[in-house]
Amino acid sequence: MKQFQVFTAEEKLKACVPAAIIPYLRIGEEEFGASNRSLTVMFASLGVELSSAETDEGLAHIQNIVTTVQEQVYRLQGSLNKLVMDDKGSTLICLWGLSPFSHEDDAARAILTGFNIIKELTKINTWCNIGISSGECFSGVVGTAGARKEFSVLGDVANLAARIMGS
């Protein structure tokens, strides 16, 4: 007989929230550590088109890619912030330096992670372009009270990582 594991709504939602945010949720902090802080930002453009999501095989490949990237990012205590798939391609945004997972060598961790992502994605016949930048930027929740909000990073550091990825 097949057994099913039962999860609470809270447990399911935690899987959708960056690990660095969970301590703020536990104490009821509304702003989730919104601040200007030193972060390392990685943008990774993946060799996957939006049309890939139209088939079961394509969706399985996308899931495999995201799982591969997550494993590498989490291994060195980074955070997968966002996956965007649109007509311009597919991009992952990853962060290092979010409290409580902040380290003096976050930039080195991001670079090593980038190399590991490229190595692992090559094994599943997927290319990627990566851009990494470090410095001071805003990180926190953006949006309107009573409406949709999301955790984001804003500033020149994030923009530079995106430009490096695209060059």
Q: Whereabouts are the PLM-identified features?
A:
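Generic non-transmembrane alpha-helical segments
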Residues: N64-S79, T113-N125
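Regulatory cytosolic signal-relay segments
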Residues: M1-L39, G47-R75
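Phenylalanine-focused residue identity feature
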Residues: F4-F7, C16, Y24, F32, ...
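Catalytic core of nucleotidyl cyclases, primarily class III adenylyl/guanylyl cyclases
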Residues: S38-E49, Q77-R109, E120-D156
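Short, well-ordered helical secondary-structure segments
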Residues: F4, E29-G33, N81, N129, ...
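Hydrophobic alpha-helical membrane-association signature
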Residues: G58-I65, R109-T113, V157-L160
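Conserved, well-folded catalytic cores of nucleic-acid-processing
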Residues: I117-E120, A145, L160-S167
